[in-house]
């Protein structure tokens, strides 16, 4: 089957790039191909962090566990331990594998938005309720907590940023979380949309920077843009595009704040779910949207080594072949993507394709 066979090139990519890695002053960001979902492994010289643990189906579920297993086989110095696991929001495509990761590997710290609802509520509740007994430090964070007292610098602490590598220490900051009260201008529907309560995390490694916003949608995006527009809080070289490249998660005002050099989209193959009855698929959602690609195209200055022709959507179940020239990557096109970042702000991108 196609989904199973993709495990082989992903692992070959992992092993080939591993040959050049050691205890050096570099970080690696693994955008793991989990189909219509998201999971990103941050690898540092002295530790590892996982942001989200989604998977589209059982084959991708097993694939994520296999990928992490091979990672820890290579990084024996980490003793099968994730210094931190972050779940941006309680949807199953972002935490499907959370329970099995907790059973298979050691997790030192776990953070989320504190919600106990949504399609991924079982796994989120499990982690929240079992953390203390498993000796996992757990915290949840809200937008109000982060911005209290007019704070526009985000928040960080030893839970959010547990990595302390000699001469290669990242700075990890949280800029948004769940909204405790309905913001002005939000409808009740906006407030009940758990995507809008996604954690927003920025990782700065010397002169390199990465931004992760979960599935934050238009109202949530506008709230953080309004909050931080007078700062460089959201400015980042590498943007993980929100909500799998949906039309409602990337705006002009937002990209003006981020000014990305590279964009990465995590989504499934365009025809995943075509002909089936399951509506929670790439085909039914129509990810990524062509208008999102076009908007990114306006802001990203550099080009991929080679342009690619790939499928993107005008709407649900309406895909078309487009040419992608700019530094826009997607797990649907490139499968697992690994970005090597240096303290001096140099990036090297490796993909399965």
Can you name each region flagged by the protein language model?
Residues 10-19:
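Hydrophobic h-region of N-terminal signal peptides that target proteins for export
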Residues 22-80, 143-235, 332-353:
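Core dinuclear metal-dependent hydrolase active-site scaffold
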Residues 2-10:
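Sec-dependent signal peptide recognition
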Residues 97-101, 125-126, 223-227, 250-258:
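A short acidic, amphipathic alpha-helical/loop segment
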Residues 109, 115-180, 185-186, 191-193, ...:
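Binuclear metal-ion centers of metallo-dependent hydrolases, dominated by the metallo-beta-lactamase
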Residues 36-38, 57-58, 90-96, 116-120, ...:
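Active-site environment of divalent metal-dependent phosphoester hydrolases
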Residues 20-26, 306, 310:
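Sec-dependent signal peptide cleavage junction
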Residues 45-49, 58-112, 116, 229-246, ...:
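Active-site metal-binding motif and surrounding structural segment of the metallo-beta-lactamase
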């Amino acid at each position: 089957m196609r989904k199973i066979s993709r495990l082989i090139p992903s692992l070959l990519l992992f092993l080939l790039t591993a040959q050049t890695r050691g205890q050096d002053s570099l970080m690696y960001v693994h955008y793991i191909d989990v189909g219509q979902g998201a999971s990103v492994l941050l690898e540092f010289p002295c530790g590892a962090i996982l942001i989200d643990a989604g998977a589209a189906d059982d084959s991708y579920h097993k694939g994520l566990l296999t990928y992490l297993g091979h990672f820890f086989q290579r990084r024996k110095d980490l003793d099968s331990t994730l210094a931190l696991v972050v779940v941006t929001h309680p949807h199953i495509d972002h935490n499907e594998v959370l329970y099995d990761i907790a059973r298979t590997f050691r997790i030192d710290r776990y953070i989320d938005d504190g919600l106990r609802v949504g399609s991924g509520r079982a796994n989120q509740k499990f982690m929240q309720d079992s953390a203390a007994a498993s000796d996992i430090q757990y915290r949840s964070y809200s937008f109000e907590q982060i911005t209290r007292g007019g704070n526009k610098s985000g928040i960080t602490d030893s839970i959010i940023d547990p990595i302390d590598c000699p001469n290669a220490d990242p700075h990890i900051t949280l800029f948004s979380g769940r909204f405790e009260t309905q913001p002005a201008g939000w409808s009740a529907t906006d407030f009940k949309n758990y995507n809008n309560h996604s954690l927003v995390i920025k990782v700065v490694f010397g002169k390199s920077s990465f931004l992760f916003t979960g599935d934050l949608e238009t109202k949530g995006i506008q709230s953080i843009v309004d909050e931080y527009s007078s700062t460089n809080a959201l400015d980042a070289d590498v943007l993980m595009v929100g909500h799998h490249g949906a039309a409602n998660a990337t705006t002009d005002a937002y990209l003006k704040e981020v000014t990305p050099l590279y964009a990465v989209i995590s989504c499934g193959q365009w025809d995943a779910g075509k002909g089936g009855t399951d509506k929670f698929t790439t085909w039914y959602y129509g990810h990524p949207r062509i208008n999102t690609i076009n908007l990114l195209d306006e802001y990203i200055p550099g080009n991929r080594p080679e342009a690619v022709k790939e499928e993107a959507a005008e709407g649900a179940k309406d895909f078309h072949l487009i040419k992608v020239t700019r530094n826009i990557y997607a797990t649907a096109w490139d499968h697992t993507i690994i970005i090597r970042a240096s303290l001096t702000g140099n990036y090297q991108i490796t993909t399965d394709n």
